[in-house]
Curated annotation (Swiss-Prot):
Family matches, as SUPFAM superfamilies: Saposin (SSF47862)
InterPro entries recorded: SAP_A (IPR003119), SapB_1 (IPR007856), SapB_2 (IPR008138), Saposin (IPR008373), Saposin-like (IPR011001), Saposin_chordata (IPR021165), SaposinB_dom (IPR008139), Sphingo_Act-Surfact_Prot (IPR051428)
Pro-peptide region(s): 18-60, 144-193, 277-306, 388-398, 480-518
Signal peptide boundaries: 1-17
Disulfide bridge positions per record: 64-139, 67-133, 95-107, 197-273, 200-267, 229-240, 311-384, 314-378, 342-353, 403-476, 406-470, 434-445
Function per UniProt: The lysosomal degradation of sphingolipids takes place by the sequential action of specific hydrolases. Some of these enzymes require specific low-molecular mass, non-enzymatic proteins: the sphingolipids activator proteins (coproteins). Saposin-A and saposin-C stimulate the hydrolysis of glucosylceramide by beta-glucosylceramidase (EC 3.2.1.45) and galactosylceramide by beta-galactosylceramidase (EC 3.2.1.46). Saposin-C apparently acts by combining with the enzyme and acidic lipid to form an activated complex, rather than by solubilizing the substrate.
Cited SMART domains: SAPA, SapB
Record: glycosylation sites: 81, 214, 328, 420
Entries under PROSITE patterns matching the protein: SAP_A, SAP_B
Lineage per the UniProt record: Eukaryota, Metazoa, Chordata, Craniata, Vertebrata
Record-given protein name: Prosaposin
Quaternary structure and partners: Saposin-B is a homodimer.
Single Gene Ontology BP annotation: adenylate cyclase-inhibiting G protein-coupled receptor signaling pathway
Amino acid sequence: MARRLLTLLGLLAAAVASPVLWQKDCAKGPEVWCQSLRTASQCGAVKHCQQNVWSKPAVNSIPCDLCKELVTVVGKVLKDNGTEDEIRSYLEKRCEFLPDQGLASECKEIVDSYLPVIMDMIKEEFDKPEVVCSALSLCQSLQKHLAAMKLQKQLQSNKIPELDFSELTSPFMANVPLLLYPQDKPKQKSKATEDVCQDCIRLVTDVQEAVRTNATFVKSLVAHAKEECDRLGPGMSDMCKSYISEYSDLAIQMMMHMKDQQPKDICAMVGFCPSVKSVPLQTLVPAQVVHEVKMETVEKATVQEKTFSVCEICETMVKEVTGLLESNKTEEEIVHEMEVVCYLLPASVKDQCKDFIEVYGQALIDMLLEATNPEAVCVMLKCCAANKPPQQPVVVKPAGGFCDICKMIVAYADKELEKNATTTEIEALLEKVCHFLPESVSDQCVQFVEQYEPVVVQLLAEMMDPTFVCTKLGVCGAAKKPLLGEDACVWGPGYWCKNMETAAQCNAVDHCRRHVWN
């Protein structure tokens, strides 16, 4: 169902894994250098591509957005003084999620070979993750995308568009005289009586003749135009060649349309000769055009964005997790897949979806693992209203109903607190955590904190794993007794507040004074 993030690094592997370039290939310029990070590295042009090609605006797409999220995470790790080994471990771990072993191996090879280059780019372009993703071929150039769409639109219709010749002829038409009349050959000067119109007609006539008789004329014209780009200097030269590479096909199409038309009519269209009458470039036939009404309907439909409630997000996650459990996925893989689902939802609910996973994710997985009816999970989590009784009996969880709320609190603590948090920080979080959970479970949260606060503080200082902490407390699991091992302090307030000695033993004197002895 949702496998796009798992294929992200696979796309990266396929995009960067290009054949080794020979020196003659590198001599072809930026068009070859900037195809991928591998080609740029082989041609020693990483900095050039980073500054002049990959920094251009990119098209929004799912692979591009996911890549930018991944690069942002790595950037934050670098900002927090994360080591290269930590980042390598993180990326290689993501490579292991790829379903295809070949792509997984290729992904790891790319990480091993180009990680220093990628890290340097992330440090330099921390606020522009799209630059790194363009280098990895996961973000597409907006300029190329628009040019391709424009060309594709023309190819899908045989309608002759109204072309702006003043825009399309430069710089190709500007180089036609140089190609037809080389400067090293002396030419007779035009007579003073010859006007611009006659010059245009002669030029168009020569171009038409060259197109008809010389099969290589068009290609040589494009090559000559690229050579002329070198006259513009280092900064503009590459941009000029890039422009020619993108728009040369369109210019060639224009020339092919010109070859069967009257030169005077063409010169009249571009304003060099007086217009006698309106003459089309060629005989028009019915065009394959989509009706405007139909196009408006489609555009309006795509703008509308579905809104999602917490209940709908929960039901979506239950359906996803149920399918993953049937596929024997590990809990780590399931959580990863749940995060992928958030990226496939509208942007307006992406953060809400992530918060849902942080608070309810582990509890949802545990309930489904314990054979809870999927239709009842969201109702039991108080995310959906109980409109109708479940069709199948629900397996009621033991331990007084504190298991789910315990896991929510521990998951929240794990998210908000740093590693090695002090007991003071943990106590401060427990005092306010109930205000951040859904109102439907706030009373149960307060009861839980009042009863288990001291031992929860001790366990969270040891480990912030929801399953470990809540099982250790005895509120989760199938144990008949809430006691695990011989530690009497996990028995709860009934033991802590028995007397001052037991309260001191379990570090619960303040708790007993506030809630029991007063």
